[in-house]
Amino acid sequence: YQLFLQRITEDRHHRHINRWWLYAAAVLALFIASYASYKSGEHGVKSSFADIEIEAPQGSRTKLNLPDGTLVWLNAGSRIAYSQGFGVDGRSVKMSGEGYFEVKKNPELPFTVKTENLLVRDIGTKFNVRDYHEDTEAVVLLSEGKVVLNDAHSADLYYLTNNQRAVLNKSTGKIEVDSYVASNSTKWINGYIQLNGESIVDIAKYFERIYNVRITVSDKRKLKYHFYGNFKRNEQSLTEVLDAMSKTGKFKYSIKGHNVTIY
């Protein structure tokens, strides 16, 4: 009889322990499921926030300050985008067109500019990036500090210091670095047009953006010409600029509304 009672007591004890483990396992499973749901929801919330986009339409320039204090100028026909968590989760922007950056220094969060063809990284510097989709080249000009960059399709790194320029040939994928007075190519911030030997094709694309017109070079023999000069965009109309350039005798032009023909 005592042995029978002992077995009953042991069976009850085992059933009590088994129920406790089942209860603990259920609580643990509920916790895991809740945590997984929370993380999934957290990711969903982050993903649901659209990036902030700012644009400089054709014929205009735009000045802005990013949440971390970085100053940005966008040239005509350019766009920049960054996440809602910029300055907290990281400092990365996407850009198309041309932008000038005065980056707020923060060694713990490097600043990154990603374009269609380039990836530029730095901590706190002043630099200019130009990468329009229709251009044959993408260019980075460093005014102050240091940056490291690479072709978006290559892991090869290039380091720039003060007054250096990196030029990516989009057709070959080759990047060349040389010395350059960076201020010459950032005068657009103050409304200047600086021509440094660009071809008539590149100049036409540039004028299309800043004057919001359509330019056609009808005489293909003119494509070989390159031009130098300085103009004040806010004070000189497109007609005045083309008049000055045409006095070289290398081309003539006509304007009908927003359409310009160079011949």
Say what each PLM segment does.
Residues 10-24, 31-263:
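A residue-level detector for the "anchor" residue at the start of short, highly conserved motifs
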Residues 1-13:
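Disordered, charged N-terminal biogenesis/targeting segments of membrane/secreted proteins
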